[in-house]
Amino acid sequence: MAKPIRVLLYYKYVPIENAEQFAADHLAFCKSIGLKGRILVADEGINGTVSGDYETTQKYMDYVHSLPGMEDLWFKIDEEEEQAFKKMFVRYKKEIVHLGLEDNNFDSDINPLETTGAYLSPKEFKDALLDEDTVVLDTRNDYEYDLGHFRGAIRPDIRNFRELPQWVRDHKEEFMDKRVVVYCTGGVRCEKFSGWLVREGYKDVGQLHGGIVTYGKDPEVQGELWDGKLYVFDERIAVDVNHVDPIVVGKDWFDGTPCERYVNCGNPFCNRRILTSEENEDKYLRGCSHECRVHPRNRYVSENDLSQEEVVSRLAAIGESLDVTPA
């Protein structure tokens, strides 16, 4: 039996005239039909994730497919029991994907319509994973990789996507002469990043067409060789990919035990995404470090209305105090 809510993930690189007005009109339409989600609009295209019941999402897909240049836009559809978003946002940005090129000159940005890596089907990508001479590079953020990733994929030491070009340049000698295959959640980041690799001089560059979400739904590969869960940017936080032999790879930030539950650090000025159990969240006041635990704006403390005495007691239980930083 079908679930009542559909989640649509999509993007398309396509020139949009008067993109700011397009974004405003798009928001008005989405609100008029009761859709929820988050959409980015730029001169270079559109990128979004939205959710609603069957009728609402069908209206939205029909509307998007009626727009110039978007007749063939590919919607990736998940069925869920509950809404994946609470509100509806449509925002105009300079780019739907920001690579963070060092000169900050948008004119030198990559246009995936002109330069991008070869598309690989899920089966072709699985073959690449099994090929010892192919480098498989995860283009997502570190916290996304830590929750789940393809077996054997390289984890760049980056906090966000715009740090990736510099990381690759720093490690260029390790795989410049090899075949390089990249992947991301739905494909939008790889379209641009694989094009950047081509421009950098990499000779054999591929990308997982449709991203991890498509790989997990493919009837042939069934998500095999994916370990852990897929981080998604909505209320679901994590979804399954591997339907053959799933395992947990996420580790609790505090004690290293298997964990797939993400929270944001209680310190709003840190906001690091960490994996942790409810028990350890309570024990460590949702702070990823001593400084975050004792920060005067710690959200966990305020949300749970903890007194100073209660905070002191919990800190003492882990060998800390309000004014002493652990060695």
UniProtKB/Swiss-Prot annotation:
Superkingdom of origin organism: Bacteria
GO biological process, one term: tRNA modification
E.C. code: 1.14.-.-
MF-aspect GO terms: oxidoreductase activity, acting on paired donors, with incorporation or reduction of molecular oxygen
Name of a matching Pfam family: Rhodanese_C
InterPro entries: Rhodanese-like_dom, Rhodanese-like_dom_sf, Rhodanese_C, TrhO, TRHO_N
Entry annotation: catalytic residues: 184 (cysteine persulfide intermediate)
Catalyzed chemical reaction(s): uridine(34) in tRNA + AH2 + O2 = 5-hydroxyuridine(34) in tRNA + A + H2O
Chain ranges of the Rhodanese domain: 130-224
Keywords from the UniProt entry: Oxidoreductase, tRNA processing
Protein family (similarity comment): Belongs to the TrhO family.
Function description: Catalyzes oxygen-dependent 5-hydroxyuridine (ho5U) modification at position 34 in tRNAs.
NCBIfam families attached to this UniProt entry: PRK00142.1-3, PRK00142.1-5
Protein name, entry field: tRNA uridine(34) hydroxylase
